[in-house]
Structures are given as structure tokens and as C-alpha cells.
A protein has these predicted regions:
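N-terminal binding-site loop/beta-alpha segment at the start of enzyme catalytic domains
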Residues: 1-77, 115
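Active-site beta-loop-alpha junctions enriched in small/polar residues
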Residues: 21-23, 53-55, 82-86, 122-125
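Conserved catalytic core of Hanks-type protein kinase domains
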Residues: 42, 82, 111
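Generic structural signal for helix capping and beta-alpha/helix-loop junctions
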Residues: 59, 86-89, 129
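Generic beta-strand or strand-like secondary-structure segments
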Residues: 64-68, 82, 100-107
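Structural motif corresponding to the early beta-alpha repeats
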Residues: 72-98
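Glycine/proline-rich, positively charged
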Residues: 92-137
């Protein structure tokens, strides 16, 4: 696997990443055991940059991914998640406040069974007030 430096972060990430939206059943249903095994296979083959969001499957993707990550050494993967877009029971919500972003980070860490997140992205900024994102989120 080819790796590249990610800006000035000091992180070296693979040129391909593992997008975990499917773990939340976003595109179709998936057996949890197969979802977890797909994470193990990806990391084993060098796809160790994993991207997820609380919005994917309305928290399910992070929850399933967390079951896989607790079985892996923390240094074996780089993790990215998002703040700003949430939803449950088919209701989409956006909240770009600093307070909600901070709460979301801690909630994600709990679901993901980790003690830190390597990268945090702001999800779907086109629905936001950019001044709030820049100055608060």
C-alpha cells in the first residue's frame, strides 16, 4: 500500500481509505460479523485510514466499527469521524454549535471504544452557517 503525508499533521495515510458508512446499513443491510471482519481485512491489507460519521446509519456505523476497533491495537489505524450532522428515526438534524460538536466527539469516542480521534471533519457544511463553523465548531 502506498502512503502519503496528510498535510502538516504528521500522519501518513494510505492512498485508499476505508469508508465505514456501509457498517451502518446505509446502502443495504449487512451482517454485523461480516462488517466487523471487513474492518479487520482492510487494516490487515494496509487500508488503515478509517472514515465514519455518527450520521451513518444513525449511530450504527460507529457502534459496529467500535466493536471491531476494540479488538485492534490503537496504533494500527487512523480514525476520522464527523460532527455537525446527526439523525435518528429518519429525522435529519444539523447542529454546528461548539457545544454540540464537543459532545459529539465524546459520544463518538464512547461508541468507537477509543480514547482519541485522529481527525474530525465537519459534515455537510453546505447546510451550515460558515461563520459558525469557522468561529465556533
Amino acid at each position: 500500500m502506498e502512503y502519503r503525508e496528510l498535510g502538516k499533521t504528521g500522519l501518513k495515510v494510505p492512498v485508499l481509505s476505508y469508508g465505514a458508512s456501509s457498517l451502518g446499513g446505509v446502502f443495504h443491510s449487512i451482517k454485523e460479523s461480516e462488517a466487523i471482519q471487513s474492518v479487520f481485512t482492510a487494516v490487515e491489507h494496509g487500508l488503515n485510514f478509517i472514515d465514519v460519521s455518527p450520521y451513518y446509519g444513525h449511530y450504527k456505523a460507529e457502534t459496529v466499527l467500535g466493536k471491531a476497533l476494540k479488538e485492534l491495537p490503537r496504533e494500527s489505524f487512523i480514525l476520522s469521524t464527523k460532527v455537525g450532522r446527526y439523525g435518528k428515526d429518519g429525522v435529519n438534524t444539523w447542529d454546528y454549535s461548539g457545544k454540540r460538536a464537543q459532545e459529539s466527539v465524546y459520544e463518538s469516542m464512547e461508541r468507537l471504544n477509543i480514547d482519541h480521534i485522529d481527525l474530525i471533519n465537519v459534515h455537510d457544511v453546505e447546510f451550515s452557517d460558515m461563520n459558525q463553523v469557522v468561529n465556533e465548531t
